[in-house]
Design a protein with these regions (language model features):
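Beta-propeller folds
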Residues: 1-447, 457-464, 514-517
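Serine-hydrolase catalytic core recognition
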Residues: 137, 146-149, 204, 255-260, ...
C-alpha cells in the first residue's frame, strides 16, 4: 500500500491511501488536515498497517495582530559573553509573529489504522519537529520545539526536547535530551552545538538510539585529538549509553548493516576531506542501570563497554575531485522499511544465520566523471582495500543512470534487474527495465526487457538545437568549461556572431586543479525548466553554466579575491565565444566589476 497527501489550495493537505493490488484509494482521515509545516506530516509504522500523522488543531483561531502598539520596541545589550553570530532573514519580529509561529507549528499526533480508519490521539498538541517510529514500532522518537523562541535565530536553532513515547499510549517513556537555544555555535565551518545531535534509531535492530556529541565543545578552532563521539542506548533506555566510536573529525552520518557491519562518516570542511570507517557495532548488550532520572544523552558512558572495532575504509582527500569520486555505497529497505547497507557476496558464500562471519562486499554507484563527461556505473567494492569491480556502466550514445535494483541473486546479493533512466541530447529521459548478464564481471551487455515510460520531447522546436561542452582557460591558467547552445542549423562562418545569454553562478573551491573538472555529460537531455534555452527560438546563443570558480588554496580564503576571480572567469568566457565567432561584445570595453551598459543593446536596456 502507498500513503500519500492530496492538496487543496483552499483547504490544505489530506491523508490518503492506495491499495495497489486492489486499485482502490481512500481518504484515511476525512475532514482532518495534515500539518506539514515542520517535517514529514505522516510516517508508516513497520507493520505496514498503521501510520502516525500530525493534524492541524481545527478549533483554535488564528492569532489576530493588535494594531495598537503596546509600547516601544526595546533592544537591550546587557553584560554577557561576546560572540560573533550570523545574520539571517525572515526571522520572528514581534509577539504576533511568535503567536503565529506557535499556531502553525502546533499539531496533534494520532495513530491511525489505514484500513479501519480507527484513530487514537497520542499525547497533547505540541510543536512537533518530527515523530520517528522505532524499527519494531513500539516507540516513537519525538522532537518538540520549546519556548522561548528567538528574534535573532531561525527555527532550526530554537530549543527543543527529544523524548521517547510509547506508540500505543503516547506516554513518555524517557527524556532523551533537552537542547537549549543554539546561540553559542562557533561561527566557523564544522562548528556544531555542544551537546547531543543527529539523534536517531539504529536501523538494523529493534529499538536502539544513537547520537553524536562534540568532544571539543563544538569549536573546530580548538586543538583536539577526538572531536566527535557516537553513542548508542538500547531499549528500555534506562541504562548507561555505550560509546560506540570516537572520531578525529566532525561526525557526518551513519549507515547500519547488521551486527557485524556498519559505516561511519567523518568530514573536515577546511580541507574538503571525508573518511568512511567500517565498524563492527555488535548487538544490543546489557548496560549498567543509570542512577536518577536524567535525560538519556546526559548520562556518562558505560565504562565496562569497549568501543566497536573499526578501521578506515575510504579516505577522500578532497571531495571536490570528481574524477576520483569513490561513489555512494548503496542501501536497501529491510523488512521493517528502514534503510540498511546492501551487502553482497560475489563468491556465493553468503553466511547462514548463526554461521561464522564472512567478509561482505558493498555495491557502489558512481558518476564516473572524466574529461569526456559523466559515465555512471555500478561496482562491487570489497571491504578489505575498497577496490572496485564494475558490473554495469552507461555507454554512449546514451546517458544511463541506475535508479534502483529491482531483483538480486539470492546467493550472492548481486543485481539481476535494474530500473534505468536513459536519455540523450534529443531524447527525453525515460524509464526501462534491464536484465543484467549472468556473469556481471565479463562486461556483457544488459538487455532492455521493458519500456515503462515513453515521454515525448516537451518542445519539438528545440529538438534540433546544438549543444557542445566547450573548454577554455582563465588568465591564471585555471581550466574552465561550459555548455554552448546554438540555434538549429547555425553555422558561425556562414551566419556570423549571435546575441548571447550567459547563465552562470559562482562556486567556491579549495583547489584550482579540481575547479576545472567536467561536471556534466554531453549526452544529457537538453532540459528546459527554468533556463534561458527558450531564447534559442529567437536566434540567441546560450552559454549555460560557464564555470565561475572562486578559489582559495591553502590558508587563503576564496572571498579574499572574490570579485577579481569572478571578473576573470567572465572575461575568459567572453573571450572564448568572441574568438570562436559565436558572439561579439556589445560594449567595446573590458569586463568590469560594475557593468557598463550600452543604450543601443536590448539586453542592457532590460
Amino acid at each position: 500500500m502507498i500513503a500519500f497527501c492530496t492538496h487543496d489550495p483552499e483547504y490544505g493537505f489530506e491523508l490518503w491511501c492506495l491499495d495497489v493490488e486492489e486499485r482502490r484509494a481512500w481518504c484515511i482521515a476525512p475532514k482532518l488536515r495534515l500539518n506539514s509545516v515542520c517535517g514529514d506530516p505522516f510516517v508508516w509504522l513497520s507493520d505496514s498497517k498503521r501510520v502516525v500523522a500530525k493534524f492541524v488543531i481545527e478549533d483554535v483561531e488564528l492569532p489576530v495582530k493588535n494594531t495598537v502598539p503596546t509600547g516601544p520596541i526595546v533592544e537591550e545589550s546587557s553584560e554577557g559573553e561576546i560572540r560573533a553570530n550570523r545574520t539571517y532573514q525572515d526571522l520572528l519580529k514581534d509577539e504576533h509573529d511568535v503567536a503565529l509561529f506557535k499556531h502553525y507549528t502546533t499539531s496533534q499526533l494520532e495513530l491511525i489504522d489505514v484500513r479501519s480508519r480507527e484513530r487514537k490521539k497520542l499525547g497533547t498538541p505540541l510543536s512537533f519537529r518530527k515523530a520517528s517510529p522505532s524499527p519494531d514500532g513500539k516507540y516513537l522518537l519525538v522532537d518538540i520545539i520549546q519556548e522561548p523562541y528567538s528574534y535573532l535565530l531561525p527555527a532550526s536553532r530554537f530549543g527543543h526536547s527529544v523524548e521517547i513515547w510509547d506508540t500505543e499510549t503516547g506516554d513518555v517513556v524517557e527524556t532523551v535530551a533537552t537542547i537549549p537555544l543554539q546561540e553559542k555555535i562557533p561561527l566557523a565551518f564544522d562548528g556544531v552545538s555542544d551537546g547531543p545531535r543527529s539523534i536517531g534509531w539504529r536501523a538494523d535492530v529493534d529499538a536502539t538510539l544513537y547520537w553524536a556529541e562534540a568532544q571539543d565543545g563544538g569549536d573546530p578552532n580548538v586543538d583536539a585529538s577526538v572531536r566527535d563521539a557516537v553513542f548508542t542506548l538500547p531499549a528500555p533506555f534506562n541504562g548507561l549509553p555505550r560509546r560506540l566510536l570516537s572520531l578525529a573529525w566532525r561526525y557526518a552520518g551513519m549507515i547500519w548493516g547488521d551486527d557485524n557491519t556498519a559505516l561511519a562518516y567523518e568530514r573536515w570542511y577546511k580541507t574538503r576531506s571525508i573518511r568512511t570507517h567500517l565498524l563492527t557495532p555488535g548487538g544490543d548488550l546489557e548496560t549498567a542501570l543509570a542512577e536518577g532520572n536524567g535525560p538519556c544523552c546526559g548520562r556518562k558512558a558505560d565504562p565496562s563497554q569497549a568501543e566497536a572495532l573499526n578501521r578506515l575504509l575510504i579516505d577522500v582527500k578532497n571531495w571536490e575531485d570528481r574524477y576520483n569520486d569513490p561513489g555512494t555505497i548503496l542501501t536497501m529497505m529491510n523488512e521493517r522499511g528502514k534503510p540498511v547497507i546492501r551487502l553482497v557476496y560475489p563468491e556465493g558464500n553468503k553466511p547462514a544465520d548463526g554461521s561464522e562471519t564472512v567478509e561482505p562486499s558493498f555495491l557502489v554507484q558512481c558518476p564516473g566523471a572524466s574529461d569526456e563527461g559523466d559515465m555512471p556505473y555500478l561496482a562491487v567494492m570489497d571491504t578489505i582495500e575498497a577496490k572496485q569491480q564494475i558490473v554495469w556502466r552507461s555507454k554512449p550514445p546514451l546517458l544511463e543512470n541506475a535508479l534502483n535494483i529491482l531483483e538480486s541473486d539470492e546467493e550472492t546479493g548481486l543485481p539481476k534487474r535494474l530500473l534505468l533512466k536513459r536519455e540523450s541530447p534529443e531524447e527525453n529521459p525515460n524509464l526501462f527495465i534491464a536484465e543484467l548478464p549472468e556473469d556481471l564481471f565479463e562486461n556483457g551487455e544488459p538487455q532492455i526487457t521493458q519500456a515503462l515510460t515513453a515521454f515525448p520531447h516537451p518542445a519539438l522546436e528545440l529538438k534540433d538545437v546544438k549543444r557542445k561542452i566547450v573548454t577554455y582557460e582563465r588568465e591564471d591558467g585555471v581550466k574552465l568549461n561550459a555548455s554552448l547552445f546554438v540555434p538549429a542549423g547555425y553555422d558561425a562562418a556562414r551566419d556570423g556572431p549571435l546575441k548571447m545569454f550567459m547563465w552562470a553562478y559562482p562556486r567556491e573551491f579549495k583547489s584550482a586543479t579540481f575547479a576545472g573538472q567536467m561536471r556534466d555529460s554531453p549526452l544529457r537531455f537538453n532540459r528546459l525548466a527554468r533556463t534561458p534555452l527558450y531564447w534559442l527560438t529567437r536566434g540567441y546563443a546560450i552559454l549555460d553554466g560557464p564555470l565561475m570558480p572562486v578559489i582559495g588554496e591553502g590558508d587563503t580564503e576564496p572571498n579574499d579575491t572574490y570579485v577579481e576571480q569572478l571578473v576573470s572567469s567572465a572575461k575568459a568566457a567572453v573571450d572564448y565565444v568572441v574568438k570562436e565567432g559565436i558572439a561579439k561584445r556589445c560594449v567595446p570595453r573590458r569586463i568590469l566589476s560594475k557593468p557598463v551598459l550600452d543604450p543601443a543593446c536590448f539586453l542592457c536596456r532590460v
